[in-house]
């Protein structure tokens, strides 16, 4: 889950309460959050608070305290009031990131202790979460008083872009950005989002001053400071719902004196952002009480809803109309509102009772069968390895063309899902070269393969792999173990000639046939695989499909 790090004094100032750590922890717990830690940083007491992944509005101290003040009945939460503003943005390009939403915050207070840092940190949190590391949403905030309207959102070739990046010492052009921000830097990791495009999207004002180059960096010319009073906010991305939601989240947490909409002109099309949805749900008191097992009155249900930041009107003596404020983007269904009522009621206030039904669980046959295979291989003298499902492209040396590739890997070590268990066993050997040889290792686990017939485009497959690694490959070691294993399964098996140069030495491998069906292969490991993992020994291994073996086993029994 995301973590909010907020200064204790900032929290107390926003709540208007002098809370001790224990009292604050209890309030958070009742609200459904957890105070992870209290630490001292540079002489300041900081709270580390775990935030649910879908509550983007709680990722800054301001948003959290808006929610807590409503929860503690200190005030009724008010939705953002957006007035029609005068700023116009002409969209004449930017097809690389086609979705755009803008707004103006006037009279914002960034001078209060911790406010400016919180404003910047919240943008980073939104980039990381709802923006998926800026791939879906990126944002820029600018000092409105430094901008000469109207604003233009357009595209230019890199060589025609010249501007001074935020806090940079000199001006650069688009082609220099790659060297100015190398891939390992904080900003450089976002260059991959646009570097393949012929043109880069940018914002500029009527004087030709470049304001930002989304999703990379803002310009130094329009940067904000703690003294900034009026802020122009621009959001771009590939999903308008996320772009519009991120804008409303930022506006909801940092409201200033007034919020103004911005007119977006795209040819003959004119729209104003942010787009407010003002969703509402009609809920019956009986529905609420049946779901929660309570006997709430209408006034109690209404009060609970208001404590969770919703506006509520009474339709009749048993029905409520609940208006969900746009900042509560996590509410998707009536069940979310019922959950909010449960939180406000207090989970510790529910009566505990045993369920009126009883069910007996049972182990999934595939898992039960896998455990039996583990037991047998352990008896044969093999040690079990438990390796990671993710690995690098370079390490995924077997069936790499069938690999599921991660879009935004955190590390080069976790780029794809494994298509074989062998790389994991090889990495285990490579990490234990100081141990006595030979190595006898096995693993029973899932691989992930592309699958067009599956709705998510991929599927898991349970595999069993065993490896012998030493001065000589000793193919007879793994072949004998596999034959004994299949004999104990009570299935008829044989081997047929098979050449797979990616896995095995030429003429040193075979298909494993069980009841006339191929379930895997066995052979002497290709030395190139050993070299890839820097293993200075020879090896032999087998890898079989456990699901196929189980289906044959169950058909016989």
Swiss-Prot record:
One of its GO terms (cellular component) is phenylalanine-tRNA ligase complex. The keyword Cell membrane does not apply. It holds the Pfam family B3_4. GO terms for molecular function: ATP binding; magnesium ion binding; phenylalanine-tRNA ligase activity; RNA binding. It catalyses: tRNA(Phe) + L-phenylalanine + ATP = L-phenylalanyl-tRNA(Phe) + AMP + diphosphate + H(+). Transmembrane segments: none annotated. SUPFAM superfamilies: Class II aaRS and biotin synthetases (SSF55681), Putative DNA-binding domain (SSF46955). Belongs to the phenylalanyl-tRNA synthetase beta subunit family. Type 2 subfamily. This is Probable phenylalanine--tRNA ligase beta subunit. It comes from Encephalitozoon cuniculi (strain GB-M1) (Microsporidian parasite).
